[in-house]
């Protein structure tokens, strides 16, 4: 059996659950239970804080788990787990920031003994050790942005996605410590077990098929026969476009291909200019 640790709340919880649902791994949640069954009797789910999941996976409490890359590093377990895939969302940066009114504008302005407030003491400590700077790390459990303004810190080390919260609190970024995205991690011993490894691989393939499909679209159209080669150059597809006969018109063929979503805006007018009509663009659930 596979124990799958998932975030019980937070910014990555909902998008992760949506991906798993699209992947066909339906999770049956009863009330506020910390454990849940899935459509596969051999896969069970446990819900936990995202910051605790790296430790749970490293210790073997869970076989696999979803968490932030930054949290794996903060827990010092990056050598005790395997990174299986990057979800490509939940992007954030751990940054060093100081009040806009301060004289700190670069890391060179940080003096020995300055105080840094953070929820990420281990990552922050490693950062300053690499810089060979001796600072005092003050661990907080929230509201880090206020620390410099109430006199308990000179700087902060905090997680940000857009930088909006920092700007609203009159803080400026001095340096980036680490960037992070949502990751699927696995216990190393679990991957050594043949049965568990096979089941984990099934989960990885299912998730990858959803993540890959999210960046693609299926485009379908009817087009003149004599324009097929020109259209083929525009939409090579994953293995070339599929072309079939249109029964109602000998001069037309049906063409469909998988294309990148970000190409659609410029692609459709070009196809239309070549005589393509009845153009349909359809989302894709999964691509294997």
Swiss-Prot record:
The keyword Transmembrane does not apply. Coiled coil: none annotated. It holds the Pfam family HisG. Pathway: Amino-acid biosynthesis; L-histidine biosynthesis; L-histidine from 5-phospho-alpha-D-ribose 1-diphosphate: step 1/9. Feedback inhibited by histidine. The keyword RNA-binding does not apply. One of its GO terms (cellular component) is cytoplasm. InterPro entries: ATP-PRT_HisG_long, ATP_PRibTrfase_cat, ATP_PRibTrfase_CS, ATP_PRibTrfase_HisG, HisG_C, N-reg_PII-like_a/b, N-reg_PII/ATP_PRibTrfase_C. Its cofactor is Mg(2+). It comes from the Archaea. Catalyzes the condensation of ATP and 5-phosphoribose 1-diphosphate to form N'-(5'-phosphoribosyl)-ATP (PR-ATP). Has a crucial role in the pathway because the rate of histidine biosynthesis seems to be controlled primarily by regulation of HisG enzymatic activity. Belongs to the ATP phosphoribosyltransferase family. Long subfamily. This is ATP phosphoribosyltransferase. It comes from Methanocaldococcus jannaschii (strain ATCC 43067 / DSM 2661 / JAL-1 / JCM 10045 / NBRC 100440).
């Amino acid at each position: 059996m596979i124990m799958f640790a998932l975030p019980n709340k937070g910014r990555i919880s909902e998008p992760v659950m949506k991906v798993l649902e699209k992947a066909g791994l339906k999770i049956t949640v009863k009330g506020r239970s910390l454990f849940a069954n899935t459509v596969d009797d051999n896969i069970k789910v446990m819900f936990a804080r995202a910051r605790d999941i790296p430790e749970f996976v490293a210790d073997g409490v869970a076989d696999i788990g979803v968490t932030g890359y930054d949290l794996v590093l903060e827990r010092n377990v990056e050598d005790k787990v395997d990174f299986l895939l990057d979800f490509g969302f939940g992007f954030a940066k751990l940054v060093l920031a100081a009040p806009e009114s301060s004289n700190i504008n670069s890391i060179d302005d940080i003096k020995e003994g300055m105080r840094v407030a953070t929820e990420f003491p281990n990552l922050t400590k490693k950062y300053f050790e690499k810089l060979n700077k001796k600072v005092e790390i003050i661990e907080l459990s929230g509201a880090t942005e206020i620390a410099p303004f109430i006199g308990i810190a000179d700087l902060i080390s905090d997680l940000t996605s857009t930088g909006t919260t920092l700007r609203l609190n009159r803080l400026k970024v001095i340096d980036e410590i680490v960037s992070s995205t949502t990751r699927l991690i696995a216990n190393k011993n679990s991957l050594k077990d043949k049965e568990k490894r096979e089941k984990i691989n099934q989960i990885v393939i299912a998730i990858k098929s959803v993540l890959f499909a999210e960046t693609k679209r299926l485009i379908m159209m009817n087009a003149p026969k004599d324009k097929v080669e020109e259209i083929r150059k525009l939409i090579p597809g994953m293995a070339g476009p599929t072309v079939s006969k249109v029964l109602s018109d000998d001069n037309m063929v049906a063409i469909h291909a998988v294309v990148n979503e970000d190409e659609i805006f410029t692609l459709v007018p070009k196809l239309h200019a070549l005589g393509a009509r009845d153009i349909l663009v359809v989302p894709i659930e999964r691509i294997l």
